[in-house]
Each structure stands twice: as structure tokens, then as C-alpha cells.
UniProtKB/Swiss-Prot annotation:
Its main location: nucleus. This is DNA-directed RNA polymerase I subunit RPA12. Component of the RNA polymerase I (Pol I) complex consisting of 13 subunits: a ten-subunit catalytic core composed of POLR1A/RPA1, POLR1B/RPA2, POLR1C/RPAC1, POLR1D/RPAC2, POLR1H/RPA12, POLR2E/RPABC1, POLR2F/RPABC2, POLR2H/RPABC3, POLR2K/RPABC4 and POLR2L/RPABC5; a mobile stalk subunit POLR1F/RPA43 protruding from the core and additional subunits homologous to general transcription factors POLR1E/RPA49 and POLR1G/RPA34. Part of Pol I pre-initiation complex (PIC), in which Pol I core assembles with RRN3 and promoter-bound UTBF and SL1/TIF-IB complex. Gene3D superfamilies: 2.20.25.10. Zn(2+) 2 binds at residues 87, 90, 115, 118. The keyword Endoplasmic reticulum does not apply. A zinc finger (C4-type) spans 20-41. It comes from the Eukaryota. SUPFAM superfamilies: Zinc beta-ribbon. The lineage of its organism: Eukaryota, Metazoa, Chordata, Craniata, Vertebrata. A motif (Hairpin) lies at residues 106-107.
Length: 126
């Protein structure tokens, strides 16, 4: 038997039963069928190979803290660094800003400015 013949009959990986021994993908849990089939490459494992294997799952719920209500003056848009920019509504010098990636990743960010005096907002695409 040649090496090429052996390659077709044995798997590429030596792995735990959680993973496909042919391509390395995570295997689905055994069901009512006689074999467990890898959803990626179609490699089959006899379901009897899984006898005695215990599957344990657990769900942990973490208690959430209480949310503190924000007043209008203390909202997230009023926080952040302040730049020397004149508010077009009230003329106040000084606007807080924050940035967001609103468009596709290969385009610039959108800068949101908020007047620290009258809370007027404007945006600028950079």
C-alpha cells in the first residue's frame, strides 16, 4: 500500500473527540444517527466512539448593577475633551466632542460636537 493510499484511509490530525480528526473543526454533539458527521468536511466518526463521554454544560448569570439615571446636562454627549470651537447657535467658545465610525471602515470617522453651554449638537465627517 502506498503513502497516497494511506492518506485516504487515515485522518490528518490526532485529536480529542470534540474536534474533527480530518480538518480540525469542532464536531456537533452525537445524536440519534450511527455516525457523527463533520459539518465542514463530511468526515464521519462512529457514534460508539463517544460512549462514556460526558457532556457538561453550565449557565452562569451575573447579577447586573443598577443603572444610574443621567440628567440631560450630564449625558454622554456632554462629556469628553473640549476643543476651541465656536457654537453656531449661541456663539460660546468651547465644544465637547466624541468620535464614532458611522460609515464603512475605509472612510473617516464622524466627529460629534456638543456645545458645553447650550447643548447644541453638530457633526462633521472627517
Amino acid at each position: 500500500m502506498s503513502v497516497m493510499d494511506l492518506a485516504g484511509t487515515c485522518s490528518s490530525f490526532q485529536s480529542d473527540l470534540d474536534f474533527c480528526s480530518d480538518c480540525g473543526s469542532v464536531l456537533p454533539l452525537p445524536g440519534a444517527q450511527d455516525t457523527v458527521t463533520c459539518t465542514r468536511c463530511g468526515f464521519n466518526i462512529n457514534v460508539r466512539d463517544f460512549e462514556g463521554k460526558v457532556v457538561k454544560t453550565s449557565v452562569v448569570f451575573h447579577q447586573l448593577g443598577t443603572a444610574m439615571p443621567m440628567s440631560v446636562e450630564e449625558g454622554p454627549e456632554c462629556q469628553g475633551p473640549v476643543v476651541d470651537r465656536r457654537c453656531p447657535r449661541c456663539g460660546h467658545e468651547g465644544m465637547a466632542y466624541h468620535t464614532r465610525q458611522m460609515r464603512s471602515a475605509d472612510e473617516g470617522q464622524t466627529v460629534f460636537y456638543t456645545c458645553t453651554n447650550c447643548k447644541f449638537q453638530e457633526k462633521e465627517d472627517s
